[in-house]
From Swiss-Prot:
Pfam families: HMG_box (PF00505)
Keywords of the record: Activator, Developmental protein, DNA-binding, Gastrulation, Nucleus, Transcription, Transcription regulation, Wnt signaling pathway
GO BP, sorted A to Z: digestive tract development; ectoderm development; gastrulation; mesendoderm development; mRNA transcription; Wnt signaling pathway
Species per Swiss-Prot/TrEMBL record: Xenopus tropicalis (Western clawed frog)
Domain Sox C-terminal: 259-376
Domain notes for this protein: The 9aaTAD motif is a transactivation domain present in a large number of yeast and animal transcription factors.
Gene: sox17b.1
Protein name (database record): Transcription factor Sox-17-beta.1
Keyword check for Transcription: yes
Tissue specificity as recorded in UniProt: Expressed throughout all the deep and superficial endoderm during gastrulation. Expression then declines rapidly after gastrulation, however a small patch of endoderm cells behind the cement gland maintains expression even into tailbud stages.
Amino acid sequence: MSSPDGGYASDDQFHGNCSVPIMMGQYEWTDPLTMFQDAKTKKEAGSANSRGKAEARIRRPMNAFMVWAKDERKRLAQQNPDLHNAELSKMLGKSWKSLTLASKRPFVEEAERLRVQHIQDYPDYKYRPRRKKQVKRMKREEEGFLPSADIPGPQVMGCNAMVGQNYKMQYSGQNSQQSQITPAGYFEDHNPVGYYYRGYNVPEYYMSQNSSVTCGPPAQGEYQALSYNFNSSYIPYQQNASAPAMGKQMAVKENIIQESPEHGIMGCQVSPQMYNGQMYVPECAKTHPVAQTEQHSSLHQSQQMVTQNYLPSQQDGHLESDIDKTEFDQYLMYEPKSDTELIYTIDQDSGAYSTNLLPSLISEANSVCYYDYCGV
């Protein structure tokens, strides 16, 4: 049979006595009201301790002004309830200064009595300042309340940083705009363009008239000044080459011009080897006269063969009288001038050798590159 209460009483009793302690016994259950009461008692205990500390602190004896202002402050506060305590203190100070010595005497005597009484009550009393202003100032500096001089503010940094930020924000939000005005001072902190290329050597082509005969290996910049690579098989004569060799080369040149008087700018193409042998001469190659003599003879043989193959077969003899041979010196870049003739020119007055090669080299390089590009 069922119980009259439907079994709820027995269930409540069972759950209340057995179920909760068994299942939830590992947790600590606290009532919120109990927590509030504990906090209140702790607060009261703390306030009592603070009052005890305040009462334990020995106050200094009052001076004459404090004795007079004790009752006067109350009277002014009743008359002027809206005034702030600071304003009341100012008014009390002015009133105290306006008093005569006779009116101040009773307050001075009362202050002296209080001082004597204080000495008798606390013979070991030593004054201790209530506030340590220096300590508080140091704490504020440590916590960062006071601005430090090492950290520049916006007014110290200037407008460059602010303008730079605005400039970046404009470009991040407006990528479609193609033209933007560069703000003033944006490139002041950047290095110039030449700063990033300081470590690279710029190729320079320079030949001095007083350069020595023997020198070290040629620099890398000298090779970069030419359009073709240097062919080491063509090496010119040394400065003290024999005069008959020079005369022989002059004769070869005149014979070639007489055989083909109409050979002009459009007449032939010069091989890069011939061009390199005439144009670029490293000074360190001037120290091998024996090898130079053998290579020089083979050089001019090959030059004669190349020029004869490229010259036209038909020759007009009636044009020989109309052509000035000196005119070809400024147009014909392929004629096999001797290396000694290109580099060393004899001064008629002094009889000394001079090396003025740079202007001729520049003109030859420009013309040959133009003719090779045109394909003639």
